Swiss-Prot record:
UniProt-annotated site: Increases basicity of active site His, residues: 84
Protein name: 4-hydroxy-2-oxo-heptane-1,7-dioate aldolase
Organism of this sequence: Salmonella dublin
Highest taxon listed in the record's lineage: Bacteria
Catalytic residues of the enzyme: 45
UniProt remark on cofactor binding: Binds 1 divalent metal cation per subunit.
């Protein structure tokens, strides 16, 4: 077993990614052929569940793009299910301290190294027990990325970086800016200073820094500072803004006057 994404991070090769929020396998496969190094299947803010994550993993599998899956929470039961359907790289949201980081790592490892439940006969990840010595190989193939998204997490960054089994730390600019008092403005100078300092600190500790940033200039700036996995766009945004721009070129205007609510 191997994890190409994990190996690329360990080798210091920057990985450029795209966020997937459309929650379906058809668009996931379409984007898997676009040339991105990694694709984030979002279970926190997109309408995904274990079944939809599975179908997207299957759709992406024939392509070079590597899947990264974000569960909705640092929950060992949910993590176990995602690993069993074939996720190897997880992005764990809202990790605040070293204990929570250790819990995330433990959830991805079989005993005695962790607490992952054994159900390989039912698991796509083990090819239904067709992979010899799966239990020993699986632990080494796991890639654990944790998100720091608050001032508390930033203050605990050094201890989070000391946790064995953490491969990378992802800075969440939207939640971080909100927690710092600048909701909706991740480009505020104070937020940017915090992000840049964190990238340098993470890389200096021998871990991979990551972030989502659709602003091209800032994304390149983060790469220059040492970020190793950078998502540079979101599928829903690409579709929405692209469709609006096309309509506008033909004189159409966005009209939401008939909308009575989000439902």
């Amino acid at each position: 077993m191997k994890n190409a994404f994990k190996n690329a991070l360990k080798a210091g090769r920057p990985q450029i990614g795209l966020w997937l929020g459309l929650a379906n396998s058809y668009s996931a496969e379409l984007l898997a052929g676009a040339g991105f190094d990694w694709l984030l299947i979002d279970g926190e803010h997109a309408p995904n569940n274990v079944q939809t994550v599975l179908t997207q993993l299957q759709a992406i599998a024939p392509y070079p793009s590597q899947p990264v899956v974000r569960p909705s929470w640092n929950d060992p039961v949910q993590i176990k299910q995602l690993l069993d359907v074939g996720a190897q790289t997880l992005l764990i949201p809202m990790v605040q301290n070293a204990d929570e980081a250790r819990n995330a790592v433990a959830a991805t490892r079989y005993p005695p190294a962790g607490i992952r439940g054994v159900g390989s006969a039912l698991a796509r990840a083990s090819r239904w027990n067709r992979i010899p010595d799966y239990f020993h190989q699986a632990n080494d193939a796991m890639c654990v990325l944790v998100q720091i998204e608050t001032r508390e997490a930033m203050s605990n960054l050094a201890s989070i970086l000391d946790v064995d089994g953490i491969d990378g730390v992802f800075i969440g600019p939207a939640d971080l800016s909100a927690d710092m008092g600048f909701a909706g403005n991740p480009q505020h100078p104070e937020v940017q200073a915090a992000i840049e300092n964190a990238i340098v600190q993470i890389r200096a500790a021998g871990k991979a820094p990551g972030i989502l940033m659709a602003n091209e200039a800032l994304a390149k700036r983060y790469l220059e500072l040492g970020a190793l996995f950078v998502a540079v766009g979101v599928d829903t945004t690409l579709l929405a803004r692209g469709a609006e721009a096309l309509a506008a070129r033909f004189g159409a205007e966005k009209n939401l006057s008939g909308a009575s609510g989000v439902y």
